């Protein structure tokens, strides 16, 4: 049974609460009003694609993907940036359904693939992603330059 669909602006109140839980999970301060503004901007500006999982009319999880492009390959990819399922609903297949939505978005948009990163210590994710067909990409190093002024303020 399919429990997932594309998010709409009508989902913002519930989605912002889930997004806030996700951010708190990653040790960020709770800020539901800012979460709602951030998500509203993503949806209205079509900056990302967001899919939600629901049970009995309540949102229990979401996945957010951003479009990226490879110049050398001359193609689009989707960056699976955020995946979250409320702790009371984990282990019930919602993450897999949300990942399937991401893969279907890739197929429908004729993108070359879905990319993601996860921490080496994320045992659940490091089991989930290969089980969903993702392959660990060992042929590159991932580097980050962080704008310390902005990072220190967030």
Annotate each language-model stretch with its function.
Residues 52, 58-67:
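Conserved beta-strand in the GNAT
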Residues 89, 93-101:
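Conserved acetyl-CoA pyrophosphate-binding loop and the N-cap/start of the following alpha-helix
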Residues 3-17:
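A short beta-loop-alpha structural element at the N-terminal edge
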Residues 40-52, 79:
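A short helix-loop-beta-strand connector motif used in the catalytic cores of GNAT acetyltransferases and
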Residues 75-87:
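Conserved acetyl-CoA binding element of GNAT-fold acetyltransferases
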Residues 106-117:
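Conserved GNAT acetyl-CoA-binding A-motif
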Residues 96, 120-139, 145:
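Conserved active-site alpha-helix within GNAT-family acetyltransferase domains
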């Amino acid at each position: 049974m399919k429990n997932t669909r594309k998010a709409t602006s009508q989902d913002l109140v519930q989605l912002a609460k889930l997004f806030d839980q996700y951010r708190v999970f990653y040790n960020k301060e709770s800020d539901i009003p800012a979460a709602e503004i951030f998500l509203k901007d993503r949806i209205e500006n079509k900056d990302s694609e967001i899919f939600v999982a629901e049970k009995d009319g309540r949102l229990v999880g979401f996945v957010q993907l951003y479009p990226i492009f490879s110049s050398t390959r001359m193609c689009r990819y989707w960056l699976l940036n955020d995946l979250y399922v409320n702790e009371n609903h984990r282990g019930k297949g919602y993450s897999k359904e949300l990942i399937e939505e991401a893969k279907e978005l890739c197929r429908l948009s004729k993108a070359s693939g879905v990319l993601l990163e996860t921490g080496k210590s994320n045992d659940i994710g490091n089991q989930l992603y290969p089980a969903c067909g993702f392959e660990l990409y060992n042929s590159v190093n991932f580097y980050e330059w962080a704008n310390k002024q902005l990072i220190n303020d967030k």
